[in-house]
Amino acid sequence: MRKPSLFNAAFVFAAAVVVMGLVYFFPPVHQRLSWRLDFAKAYFRGVVDPVEAPPTSLPNPEVVVNNHASSTPTTTPHPSATPTEVFTPTPLPSPTPLPQKIALEPPRWEYQDINNCGPAALAMYLRFYDWDGDQHSIADALKSQREDRNVNVEELAYFVRTNAGWLNYEYRVGGDLDLLKQFLAAGIPVMIEESFYFEGPYWPNDDLWAAHYQLLTGYDETNQTFTGQDSYHGADQEIPYETVDEYWQAFNRVYILIYLPHQEETVKAILGPQWNPDYNRQQALEAAQAETESDPEDTFAWFNLGSNLTYFERYLEATDAYDQARDLGLPQRMLRYQFSPFIAYFHSGQIDDLLALTEYALKITPNSEEALLWHGWGMYRQGKNNDALANFRQALIENSNYLDAQYAIDFLGAN
């Protein structure tokens, strides 16, 4: 009699497991529970391997010199450090003062899925121009896996240009509050990347800091606030000017502009010479330099200085700036979102620093394709080609759209 009972119990248990699995992957249930599963995995990792602060600069870094020209990956832009051409904008018909208040018609709001603030904010931005998609169509195009925690501005640009080509897309850095108001007054919403703070820890000793995309659709001079369509906190959020600038600084004050083709002359006129990306970067570099001088303890000012120097391929100067930022203390998740330090330390030959940073980044975000890529390049510089190839292949597994990883694999195959 006991054998049928055991068989029945095993059958019921197996059936229950199957049903639970089917229920878990039912989209409404999966969207709710996957957040908790993501949290549980991160917290478990943090208990087993405690998360500390990002590594500070090495006291006497060894510089690896490689005389083979072919040993340098060609995955970074190569602009001139001094702009050779300054764009002359077409002036607006009449430079009238900014209105006291602007409230653009907000697009239909949607709550972001897990790790999806970029696609959600972009979906709302495109919806302002009557696009009929949602965050999931954007995420499906840009992210091989739902667990991908970062979508950068270049990836967002790729989506707009390939899926909403009737709109124009530009981004610049080093923005300021007045510039945001000018675009809003011209009828153009602005999307920015900014700091975000979790409500609770994802691991013991979590500093709670992360990144977030915010869509601005208005401002109010009387109340000194911007209106944000926030995919996490809700629609029509009133955000103080001071908070916007403080949170924005961590991302080099990057701003994204999406607009109709006939609005391009207006955009050029507002940007003036900063329509030229090199000129814009030079201005951002000088602004970051000034901030480091006015407050030498400003971590983000030093980090931004390093990023702008990296853009101009001034790698040794960039690593000096990054060293300052690291010694002052970076947020734990900083290298989940920004990768210019990897580029600067690689090209300056400071491979020990590169490996220390990429290994820390992978401890925080094990599926970061960018950290895997640059950890692989560090391995390559140390002559560990098999380890490098394993990193490159894993980066491509994490994001099958990642062309830099495919380039790296092909590069090793050719050398």
Question: PLM features: residue spans?
Answer:
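Noncatalytic regulatory segments and standalone regulatory/sensor domains
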Residues: 200-203, 207-208, 217-312, 317, ...
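Register position in tetratricopeptide repeats
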Residues: 311, 347, 381-382, 411-415
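Ser/Thr-rich, Proline-interspersed low-complexity disordered segments
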Residues: 36-100, 394, 415
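N-terminal Sec-pathway targeting helices
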Residues: 1-15
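Cysteine-nucleophile protease catalytic domains, especially the papain-like/related folds used
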Residues: 91-179, 185-186, 251-274, 297, ...
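Terminal, low-structured helical/coil segments at or just beyond the last alpha-helical repeat
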Residues: 386-415
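Alpha-helical adaptor scaffolds
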Residues: 307-316, 320-377
